[in-house]
UniProtKB/Swiss-Prot annotation:
GO terms assigned for molecular function: asparaginyl-tRNA synthase (glutamine-hydrolyzing) activity; ATP binding; glutaminyl-tRNA synthase (glutamine-hydrolyzing) activity
Record field: catalytic activity: L-glutamyl-tRNA(Gln) + L-glutamine + ATP + H2O = L-glutaminyl-tRNA(Gln) + L-glutamate + ADP + phosphate + H(+); L-aspartyl-tRNA(Asn) + L-glutamine + ATP + H2O = L-asparaginyl-tRNA(Asn) + L-glutamate + ADP + phosphate + 2 H(+)
Native organism: Geobacillus stearothermophilus
Protein name: Aspartyl/glutamyl-tRNA(Asn/Gln) amidotransferase subunit B
Keyword flag DNA-binding: no
Species classification: Bacteria, Bacillati, Bacillota, Bacilli, Bacillales
Top enzyme category: ligase
Keywords for the protein's UniProt record, in alphabetical order: ATP-binding, Ligase, Nucleotide-binding, Protein biosynthesis
Entry-linked Pfam families: GatB_N, GatB_Yqey
Length: 476
């Protein structure tokens, strides 16, 4: 029997408000342990939560960007469970009346577009953070306790790990564009749990699902789902039964490990939060929030294609993160040719960032300096090959491209008389290559160009070198 994979994702996103969702404690990453918490976060007797209006607006903004219907009335509920990082023994969340529902985003995998439904988006508070020492005890940091979160629950519309990866990339991009979160997985501001099951192809009944945790990167989400699909497939094909359970992805072995048998919602004994009143979202408030939503990835991608003539693939890559899209737009605004700017960002800049494991904001390169360098290529002052030397200087130390070119003697040689002399010397030194080219071996010309470039230390104007070589060979 053949099976298909059914996947749903639960994504938690921390909202970057200045204070926490129900208290005035600061909401910032990286502070010393237990320095950003107060009696409300810790649930001291007699204290009362006060809802952060900015958190609601950020959640509403994200929900609108994800095409959700915004509830006119919503409420908060207590989710009851005991764990050391949860000092109140309950979490304030939303159960049966979430802020947003019935949304969707469009993904593209292997050239095919597909809509993935979003069941709901709700607000809740984050828990603290446990650090296991390995010495028989654990440390608890309550700085994260009470941080405003949105949980984004997808429909079980995802059919492969590749689709899950594409969904997460698109979701992250949209959230970052709205400005409500930085979505840094390494800091925990975006976290993902995955639910996966198998069912016979053609069936409309869902199989028993497994929840996967400890998925600390999009690649680990993909790896965990790939492994779990194979594990469940082997069990089903051998006549076994899948248990509903929670499993942890092990980064070292690239396998999933049983954590616990899965709880149902009834295990949490939800009931309405008695210390918070019903929240009413009137039309005026909704429209004000909607008006604050900036241009989103799909719209920007379309604009880059229509206004600047970029290929769709280039536009898609450039708009995948807001930081890259903004950098590209600023580079073009400073006079760079859009296609050249796109090529440099997609190849040289992205290659450097990947090799160094850095982000754009970590390097010295600016849109102004990149545009200035590209304009030197456009006006023939330097070649693309020489530009790579200038780029290395800009990306590591910043500076003025024109000044760098002059100080390092990198100006492209475009003097026809000077180049013709070098061309003649190269032709005299390589008579066999000349004969090969005359006999139809085009690669011989490439060799001769390389010899001229070598003689000029890469500073000769390549199109002019080609032209002069062909002219002089014809004379022989």
């Amino acid at each position: 029997m053949n099976y298909e994979t059914v996947i749903g994702l639960e994504v938690h996103v921390e909202l970057k408000t200045k204070s926490k969702i129900f208290s005035s404690s600061p909401n910032a990453f990286g502070a010393p342990p237990n320095t950003q918490t107060n009696v409300i976060d810790l649930g001291y007797p007699g204290v009362l939560p006060v809802l952060n209006r900015q958190a609601v607006e950020f959640a509403m903004k994200a929900a609108m960007a994800l095409n959700c219907e915004i509830a006119t009335e919503t409420k908060f509920d207590r989710k009851n469970y005991f764990y050391p990082d949860n000092p109140k023994a309950y979490q304030i969340s939303q159960y049966d009346q979430p802020l947003g529902k019935n949304g969707w985003i469009e993904i593209e995998v292997n050239g095919k577009k597909k809509k993935i439904g979003i069941t709901r988006i709700h607000l809740e508070e984050d828990a603290g953070k446990l650090t296991h020492t390995g010495d028989g005890y654990s440390l608890v940091d309550f700085n994260r306790q009470g941080t405003p979160l949105i949980e984004i629950v997808s429909e079980p519309d995802i059919r492969s790990p590749e689709e899950a990866y594409a969904y997460l990339e698109k979701l992250k991009a949209i959230i970052q564009y709205t400005g409500v979160s930085d979505c840094k997985m390494e800091e925990g501001s975006l976290r993902c749990d995955a639910n996966i099951s198998l069912r016979p192809i053609g069936s409309d009944q869902f199989g028993t699902k497994t929840e996967l945790k400890n998925l600390n990167s999009f690649n680990f989400v993909r790896m965990g789902l790939e492994y779990e699909a194979k594990r469940q497939g082997k069990i089903l094909l051998s006549g076994g039964v899948i248990r509903q359970e929670t499993r942890r992805f092990d980064e070292a072995t690239k396998t999933t490990i049983l954590m616990r048998v899965k709880e149902g919602s009834e295990d949490y004994r939800y009931f309405p939060e008695p210390d918070l009143v019903m929240l009413y979202n009137d039309d005026e408030w909704k429209e004000r929030v909607r008006a604050s939503i900036p241009e989103l990835p799909d719209a920007r991608q379309k604009r880059y294609v229509e206004e600047w003539g970029l290929p769709e693939y280039d536009a898609k890559v450039l708009t995948l993160t807001k930081e890259m899209a903004d950098f590209f737009x600023a580079t073009v605004a400073n006079g760079a040719d859009p296609k050249l700017a796109s090529n440099w960002l997609m190849v040289e800049v992205s290659g450097y960032l990947n090799a160094k494991q850095k982000e754009l904001h970590d390097i010295a390169l600016t849109p102004e300096s990149l545009a200035s360098m590209i304009k030197l290529i456009q006006n023939g002052t330097i070649s693309s090959k020489i530009a790579k030397k200038v780029f290395k200087e800009l990306v590591e130390h910043s500076g003025d491209p024109e000044k760098i070119v002059k100080e390092k003697g990198l100006v492209q040689i475009s003097d026809e008389g000077a180049l013709r002399k070098i061309v003649l010397e190269v032709l005299d030194a390589n008579p066999q290559s000349v004969e090969d080219y005359k006999n139809g071996k085009d690669r011989a010309l490439g060799f001769l160009v390389g010899q001229v470039m070598k003689a000029t230390k890469g500073q000769a104007n390549p199109p002019l070198v080609n032209k002069l070589l062909v002219e002089e060979i014809k004379k022989r």
